[in-house]
Amino acid sequence: MSQNTLKVHDLNEDAEFDENGVEAFDEKALSEEEPSDNDLAEEELLSQGATQRVLDATQLYLGEIGYSPLLTAEEEVYFARRALRGDVASRRRMIESNLRLVVKIARRYGNRGLALLDLIEEGNLGLIRAVEKFDPERGFRFSTYATWWIRQTIERAIMNQTRTIRLPIHIVKELNVYLRTARELSHKLDHEPSAEEIAEQLDKPVDDVSRMLRLNERITSVDTPLGGDSEKALLDILADEKENGPEDTTQDDDMKQSIVKWLFELNAKQREVLARRFGLLGYEAATLEDVGREIGLTRERVRQIQVEGLRRLREILQTQGLNIEALFRE
């Protein structure tokens, strides 16, 4: 028997055939395997139901926290002092009175990979941390201090979900060629090569090389860990000015005044480099190369001063019970 011959026992003994010998399939059985309009409608209703439950839970939570009265400046100091001495009721009062602040901040981070309730939950952790760390004798309003910690915990949660900066693959490949050549030249020349030296090595226009190196620097400058015990990058903590509304004016003014005060505890060179690099004190954020050109220093020297300035700034903030993330963000 050839391999193409159909064996009788290969047939379904219960199969029905039409008059042409073609097996007649059970159309009812087939239709049951495909989703009907009713099935799709049911799935849509289930999805809508799940969404509605999330909305209901959110509204319920917002309704509950709406009954917590805000504290006056005097009440903040009173309850903060008692909380520092271990009074649980005062600690709870400070947390409950600022839950709406968490919601306001969390709403700014919508469509960033986490649901609103998840953002609120993360922000509440930051609020609790702020209550534990807050010292009313330092002159801050608690809302300003808490905002830093709330934003930091939310940003960290979002960071764990996704990175923000993406480059087209052809740009990445071209950039890698320039960076590899720069590394090779730095070993050969015993100094960091200039854009002109890289361009000559690759036989490329200097402007093209400079543009790509500036692109890389803008990315890495905000995507490089700040150092110390922090693995967080400036990308994850720099404020988005579009987030600020009129209601943020008071706490933003407090924050700016604090930043200016701390920057002026650095030496003049460190202060100018950090201000120019990160867009502070009225400067536009600039690359190491651009800053060096403006103040008459090499790119490498500017980088060294930046590292020294951030290290000194971290020390200053630690004496205030803060960290460098709290300064640059949120």
Swiss-Prot record:
Localization (cell): Cytoplasm
GO annotation terms (biological process): DNA-templated transcription initiation
Ranges for region Sigma-70 factor domain-3: 174-249
Location of the region described as Sigma-70 factor domain-4 in the Swiss-Prot/TrEMBL record: 262-315
Record region (Sigma-70 factor domain-1): 56-89
One Pfam family here: Sigma70_r4
Molecular functions per Gene Ontology: DNA binding; sigma factor activity
Record feature DNA-binding region, as residue ranges: 288-307
Annotated knockout phenotype: Decreases expression of genes encoding virulence proteins. In strain JSG210 wild-type growth rate and motility, slightly increased biofilm production in vitro, does not persist in inoculated tomato cotyledons (cv. Tiny Tim seedlings). Wild-type strain JSG210 has high persistence in tomato plant organs; fresh produce contaminated with Salmonella contributes to food safety risks. Decreases virulence in mouse.
GO annotations of cellular component type: cytoplasm
Principal subcellular localisation of the protein: cytoplasm
Family under the similarity heading: Belongs to the sigma-70 factor family. RpoS subfamily.
Subunit comment: Interacts with the RNA polymerase core enzyme.
NCBIfam families: PRK05657.1 (NF004207), rpoS_proteo (TIGR02394), sigma70-ECF (TIGR02937)
Protein name as it appears in the record: RNA polymerase sigma factor RpoS
Lineage summary: Bacteria, Pseudomonadati, Pseudomonadota, Gammaproteobacteria, Enterobacterales
Gene: rpoS
